[in-house]
């Protein structure tokens, strides 16, 4: 569908990029080694250094290419000033980013087909021959698969995450803040044809989002950004991690996994009045109470 084009890119709002000196919307410097060390911490040391450094270095030059294709950048908005050194924000957000790319592609003569999911590929002797959209066969000299991952495929998520010690299937309670169309169809197809698989299917960019968010496509406005400013407990009232372990932009992507390991795959972030206005508020308002007992009552009602 045209309205859903671009996949998860439509939900993004910035790009973390390496730079050795101040640039238009970036202050100070964010050198390669610091970027690498940040990535190493977030992944717990489990990452491919050669591939990671390739991406990090490329991030220092990709913005010029993006500008050529109509993407504009702006300084961070209120609530995100702490990443003014590391992240370049897209003017208009992810939707504007996607629209700019599609306009550029159309100017270059690229034919865009909507409502045309590729069901399978014809691969012979390891070479691409054709792609199928229903009964339509489309031949080409080469094929680039930019079809996303499998994070919207509940069955595959179940297979990867399995059953925990409490007898729960954690993946059944996952909310996907991105596109519902990343089903991994072509990924499965390529694996069946002998493509190499790298990485760990249980690893992901998983953030803590509001449990009241829709099953798919809630986007960044459902992210809970107050974690580092308070305490987080599970449904049994137990804390399960150091909320202020590190600077929040370096740690927010681990909290989805941490919550997924808790009973019912749910947690509660509790802050006091001093934290109000110091983080990007989610689209759903939080529960407010004047006393701890009253707060507990409200929480039990959620």
Task: Report residues per predicted region.
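Glycine-rich loop(s) and the adjacent beta-strand/alpha-helix scaffold that form part
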Residues: 138-210
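Conserved beta-strand-loop-beta-strand element in the redox core of flavoprotein oxidoreductases
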Residues: 121-137, 143
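Conserved N-terminal/central alpha/beta ligand/cofactor-binding core
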Residues: 3-111, 117-120, 156-159, 163, ...
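An anion/pyrophosphate-binding glycine-rich loop and adjacent beta-alpha core
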Residues: 183, 187-189, 193-296, 300
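Charged, often glycine-rich, active-site loop that binds/positions anionic groups
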Residues: 84-94, 130, 213-221
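Small-residue helix-packing and pore-constriction motifs in hydrophobic alpha-helices
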Residues: 17, 21-23, 175, 287, ...
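Hydrophobic alpha-helical scaffolding
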Residues: 52, 87-95, 173-180, 222, ...
């Amino acid at each position: 569908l045209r309205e859903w084009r671009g996949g998860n890119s439509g939900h993004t709002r910035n790009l973390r990029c390496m730079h050795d000196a101040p640039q238009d919307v970036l202050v100070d410097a964010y050198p390669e080694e610091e970027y690498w060390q940040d990535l190493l911490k977030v992944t717990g040391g489990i990452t491919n250094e050669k591939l990671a450094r390739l991406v990090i270095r490329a991030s220092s030059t990709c913005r010029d290419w993006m500008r050529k294709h109509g993407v504009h950048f702006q300084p961070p908005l209120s609530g995100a000033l702490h990443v003014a050194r590391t992240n370049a924000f897209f003017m208009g957000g992810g939707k504007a980013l996607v629209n700019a790319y599609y306009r550029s592609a159309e100017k270059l003569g690229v034919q865009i087909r909507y409502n045309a999911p590729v069901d399978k590929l014809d691969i012979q002797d390891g070479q691409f021959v054709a792609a199928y959209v229903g009964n339509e066969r489309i031949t080409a000299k080469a094929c680039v698969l930019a079809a996303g991952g499998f994070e919207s495929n509940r069955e595959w998520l179940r297979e990867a995450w399995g059953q925990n010690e409490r007898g729960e299937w954690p993946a059944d309670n996952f909310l996907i803040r991105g596109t519902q169309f990343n089903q991994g169809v072509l990924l499965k197809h390529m694996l069946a044809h002998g493509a190499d698989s790298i990485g760990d299917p249980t690893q992901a960019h998983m953030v803590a989002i509001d449990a009241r968010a829709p099953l798919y496509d809630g986007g960044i406005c459902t992210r809970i950004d107050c974690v580092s400013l308070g305490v987080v407990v599970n449904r049994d009232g137990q804390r399960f991690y150091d909320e202020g372990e590190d600077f929040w932009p370096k740690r927010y992507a681990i909290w989805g996994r941490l919550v997924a390991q808790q009973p019912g795959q749910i947690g509660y972030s509790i802050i006091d009045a001093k934290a109000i206005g110091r983080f990007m508020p989610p689209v759903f308002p939080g529960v407010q109470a004047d006393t701890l007992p009253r707060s507990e009552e409200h929480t039990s009602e959620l």
